[in-house]
From Swiss-Prot:
It catalyses: D-glyceraldehyde 3-phosphate + pyruvate + H(+) = 1-deoxy-D-xylulose 5-phosphate + CO2. Thiamine diphosphate binds at H87, G128, H129, S130, G160, A161, N188, F295, E384. This is 1-deoxy-D-xylulose-5-phosphate synthase. One of its GO terms (biological process) is thiamine biosynthetic process. Signal peptide: none annotated. The gene is dxs. GO terms for molecular function: 1-deoxy-D-xylulose-5-phosphate synthase activity; magnesium ion binding; thiamine pyrophosphate binding. InterPro entries: Dxylulose-5-P_synthase, THDP-binding, Transketo_C/PFOR_II, Transketolase-like_Pyr-bd, Transketolase_BS, Transketolase_C. HAMAP family: DXP_synth. GO terms for cellular component: cytosol. SMART domains: Transket_pyr. Its EC number is 2.2.1.7. Catalyzes the acyloin condensation reaction between C atoms 2 and 3 of pyruvate and glyceraldehyde 3-phosphate to yield 1-deoxy-D-xylulose-5-phosphate (DXP). It comes from Alcanivorax borkumensis (strain ATCC 700651 / DSM 11573 / NCIMB 13689 / SK2). The keyword Hydrolase does not apply.
Length: 645
């Protein structure tokens, strides 16, 4: 049995056997009985390393045994392991030469929190979004076949990710190609099936045994010349499986289903994988695991321990704490909390409101709504396409759907947004969470493309609140609009604005001027408003909180263009196609000739690190905004002087 820990070690644990493993090749030299010790040392080191820097926690703890068994049986990196989503990849990184760097994970300049091809040859496919592993692994299996190689490909996918359509699309194709692909279903909350009792466990062991597999494969070859006999045997086998397992779905698709087996018994995993490794055709191994395995608090609260912050050691000397913390130290609500509170308040007023989320209840702030309004709450699992079209169908029946979705995940439902919502002018409100840079989760989770892909869609309106109160009011404004609307807001807390409980519909397409200045006008969008205001003071610049990206406040922009010599747009979005591009288009349409400076994210993927650090590196903090404006003003002055000469 693996060890269970109750505390996260604050000092590096003693891991003598793990320390000898520089690569999976070293792991494969060990006798099988030593793997249990490797498992315990790896899990303890994982607890320590994540405690040092913070990061995804429960998923990695749950696949320690599986990770060890896979690298022990498969000749990685020649054999390909594809981890779905990637939250569970930390043990994999520890075993593949990155053990001592793990304390830098998700930090600027450190390891990525997800598998990343440029980081290691063992990271065979970059991930972050869910349900892509089977497609990628199948592509690798087909590529190996075309090259005449016997390399193996394995996709490791969780039960949540298995609910997405792409996973089944890939499995259907794999069954058609009959490629040598192993899919491991890592089932850590029994959402796929719930097999109970000794009969189920008994048959699961039989189906995973070497003798049964050999008998099955040999019989298939012999009986292939006698179709009637083989059909009878196959139907008998299926009937036996169906008595004790509801997972006939995978057999019906065309996979040989094995399991379920205990994902925390490393010896059973090794034995089963050894039996499966050389089989021909698509195989599915179903393993049961516990998220947070080996750390008692995480096993008791897997949702709360999905990820953790850095563990700070307690100071030896007690520091006096003020009886009344300053306003700066008071805990500010996150934008997700503001959305969740607005959703509940709005639902109390309007019985037509329906909340929809694709498996992001906690992250999107919908827990309270799900408890208070269970009949009007739909978690559709990792099915973004379905979420959007479901909302469209509800709108057809005079309901008022609100879809809470991360900006980066709405990309998956783009066709549905155009075809099933916007084209039909259906009344659907989208709460776009994690808009802009997200920080430690990196490029896979950045919401930096939404303005570009949304503002091209007819009938769509887009709001970008600058603070907590504006977020609440713009959500209300979007909800009151009879048509598709999106409100984008960042991860985490805002500047600390007082939130008015009264909800007021703000005029669509109307900005507000926050500061009057000379020469320079800054058109700030969303979360960039506070930094723009700070930069404007030494510049004596005008600052306009634009509020809306579509429609733009044309009058305010043209007025600012007429009264200033430099127009500056600031946004936490890719420059191409973003809000600045929209302003440029408007000025071009109106034949306005003016110097315009577009400050936005550069044309490359921005990787992981603290959000404020990444914004500063992109020149989107107050100092960077001021510096770039001064550089442009100096350039204007040089051009004027050159013209005068």
């Amino acid at each position: 049995m693996p060890k269970t820990f109750t505390q996260i070690p604050l000092t590096r644990p003693n891991t003598p056997l793990l320390d000898t493993l520089a690569s999976p090749a070293d792991l494969r030299k060990l006798p099988t009985p030593q793997l249990e010790r490797v498992v315990d040392e790896l899990r303890e080191y994982l607890l320590y390393a994540v405690g040092q820097c913070g990061g995804h926690f429960g998923a990695g703890l749950g696949v320690v045994e599986l990770t060890v068994a896979l690298h022990y049986l498969y000749h990685t990196p020649d054999d390909k392991l594809v981890w779905d989503v990637g939250h569970q990849c930390y043990p994999h990184k520890i075993l593949t030469g990155r053990r001592e760097s793990l304390t830098s994970i998700r930090q600027a300049g450190g390891l990525s929190g997800f598998p990343k091809r440029s980081e290691s040859e063992y990271d065979t496919f970059g991930v972050g979004h869910s349900s892509t592993s089977i497609s990628a692994a199948l592509g690798m299996a087909l590529g190996a076949e075309m090259a005449g190689s016997d390399r193996r490909a394995v996709a490791i996918i969780g039960d949540g990710a298995m609910t997405a359509g792409q996973a089944f699309e890939a499995m259907s194709h794999a069954a058609h190609t009959r490629s040598n692909l192993l899919v491991i279903l890592n089932d850590n909350n029994m959402s796929i099936s719930h097999n109970v009792g000794g009969l189920s466990n008994y048959f699961a062991r039989i189906w995973a045994s070497k003798s049964y597999i050999a008998l099955r494969e040999g019989g298939k070859k012999v009986l292939s010349t006698m179709p009637a006999a083989w059909d009878f045997i196959r139907r008998t086998e299926e009937s036996m499986k169906n008595m004790v397992s509801p997972d006939m779905l995978f057999e019906a698709i065309g996979f040989n289903y094995i399991g379920p087996i205990d994902g925390h018994n490393v010896n059973e995993l090794v034995s089963t994988l050894r039996n499966l490794r050389d089989l021909e055709g698509p195989q599915l191994l179903h393993v049961y695991t516990t998220k947070g395995k080996g750390f008692a608090p995480a096993e008791a609260d897997p949702v709360g321990y999905h990820a953790i912050n850095k563990i700070e050691p307690k100071p030896k000397v007690q520091v006096a704490v003020p009886s009344k913390p300053s306003a700066a130290k008071q805990k500010l609500p996150k934008y997700q909390d503001i959305f969740g509170q607005w959703l509940c308040d709005m639902a109390e007023q309007d019985p037509r409101l329906v909340g929809i989320t694709p498996a992001m209840c906690e992250g999107s702030g919908m827990v309270e709504f799900s408890r208070r309004f269970p009949g009007r709450y739909h978690d559709v699992a990792i099915c973004e396409q379905h979420a959007v079209t479901l909302a469209g169908g509800l709108a057809c029946e005079n309901q008022k759907p609100v879809v809470a979705i991360y900006s980066t995940f709405l990309q998956r439902g783009y066709d549905q947004l155009i075809h099933d919502v916007a084209l039909q002018e259906l009344d659907v409100t989208f709460g776009l969470d994690r808009a802009g840079l997200v920080g430690e989760d990196g490029a896979t989770h950045g919401g930096v493309f939404d303005l570009a892909y949304l503002r091209t869609v007819p009938n769509m309106i887009i709001a970008a609140p600058s603070d907590e109160n504006e977020c609440r009011q713009l959500l209300y404004s979007a909800y009151q609009h009879e048509g598709p609307a999106a409100v984008r807001y960042p991860r985490g807390t805002g500047p600390g604005a007082t939130i008015e409980q009264t909800m007021t519909a703000l005029p669509i397409g109307q900005s507000r001027t926050l500061r009057e200045g000379l020469q320079v006008a800054i058109l700030a969008f969303g979360a960039m408003v506070p930094a723009a205001l700070e930069a404007a003071i030494p510049l004596n610049a005008t600052v306009i909180d634009m509020r809306w990206v579509k429609p733009l406040d044309r009058d305010a922009i043209l007025r600012a263009a007429a009264q200033h010599t430099l127009l500056v747009t600031v946004e936490d979005h890719q420059q191409m196609g973003g809000a600045g591009s929209a302003v440029n288009e408007l000025l071009h349409e109106e034949a306005v000739v003016l110097d315009v400076l577009n400050l936005a994210l550069p044309d490359h993927f921005i990787h992981h690190g603290k959000r404020d650090v990444l914004l500063a590196q992109a020149g989107l903090d107050a100092a960077g905004i001021e510096r770039q404006i001064r550089e442009r003003l100096n350039r204007q002055q040089r051009l004027r002087e050159a013209h005068q000469r």
